[in-house]
Amino acid sequence: MAIRHLLKLSRRSQQTLATTTRSASTATAVSTASDTRAPAPPPPNQMIYDRLAEQVKSKLKRLEHPDPRFLKHNSPIPAAADHTSLLTYPETRITTLPNGLRVATESNLASKTATVGVWIDAGSRFETDETNGVAHFLEHMIFKGTAKRSVRHLEEEIENMGGHLNAYTSREQTTYYAKVMGEDVPKALDILSDILQNSAFDDRLINRERGVILREMEEVGAQTEEVIFDHLHATAFQHTPLGRTILGPAENIEKITKKDIQEYISTHYSAHRMLTAEFLYDYMLQVISASGAVKHEDVVEQVKKMFTKLSANPITTSQLVEKEPALFTGSEVRMRDDDMPLAQFAVAFNGASWTDPDSVALMVIQAMLGSWNQSAGGGKHMGSILAINEIAESMMAFNTNYKDTGLFGVYAVAKADCLDDVAFAIMQEISKLCYRVGDDDLLRAQNQLITYGRRIPFAELFARIDAVDAATIKRVANRFIFDQDIAIAASGPVKLLPDYNWFRRRTYMLRY
């Protein structure tokens, strides 16, 4: 009797367990079907690093289907990218006048402001040793009054328009530009034409401006980065016009005369040496450029009437460059000063000209190397290596293009006892591009590279950048870096900086 009772209880408990199991299974199925929005939380005994791994996996899944609003131009899903901004960007219109002067405009009538400027292919490269500094001196004197406008009248006219008039000089170009309201564009063009064709160059004001330029030279001399790059050009392009400084030596500034300035204008400020931003680096001409609230036809007619006294000198800058080419010389210059707190140096290779087909690839390489500053936080590729090891204060990859050559390399600032490690890290990152290029690094550099220095349609620019693949990077790196001469400029406590032969060997041998 007792055994029969126990068997009955056993069968009843099994039926209850089966019913409970079926109910739980049904509830689980319903829950799975209705609640798929959030994954179940991890069990309590799961380790912290396991939870982090699950989070990483979740992020990777989201990256496989990114938001199309944030896709880059070279996205793996280009069909989802929005190219409306490229299609609506204002067209660059170019007109060449009978005297050779070129007029370029980008019209955006919805804008209330405009920028008009004159770009001239004239800089320190086209001076002589005796006149070095006259191009920059001319930039200062161009605002010191004309036959019909005194200095005060010129300043008041610009200020009354609420405008901004400025200029700058480089090794190959000089630019004068004005930022004004759209309705004041004719006045701005009149001012630019007046100062470029009718400047008085009063001897009294010339003598006064000498002191201003000499003080400017002292200020530039205190900017160590400017000093490094001036010395880098001087040693890399020694005994060539491109090695001259923009400001010129102090002895030249003290003896430049009105005649020197006028001769420079008549020789280099000719109409056929004015060029649009579209072809600014492909030819040796001069430019009238306007953008914003402007109409192309109106600007062309105004330029025709105003710019009538430009020089007709037939000499082109192409002829000048061919006569005195910038030849790269492997060399170094070191200015040791142990009293300075930090050492800085630049290592440069002979780079590409603006017209070189590999110039875009070098720009991508520059973006791959990146830049970094300790005070600005994290940086890009090589900068992160220097940051992790805390061996540099800052670094910057640079790529400077000229008409027939260029300079490509890295500039760095570091403590004296870290120079050896910094130099090795820099040369390792540069040289390994000849052997190994990561697709991720290449894609990142392409996405960061959005400027070229001259007006190119965005679609063409993106196509040029996207055409650079890993094989192109290695080919260009072997052309410009592998076993090539270098130029070095260094200043500060540079006793521990490796010698020239150490750097030169690491263009072909990656060994500490």
Task: Annotate each language-model stretch with its function.
Residues 2-76, 90, 96, 107, ...:
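Charge-rich, well-structured scaffold segments of protease-associated domains
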Residues 100, 107-158, 232, 357-370, ...:
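Active/ligand-binding-proximal structured segments within catalytic/core domains
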Residues 377-378:
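Basic, alpha-helical interaction scaffolds
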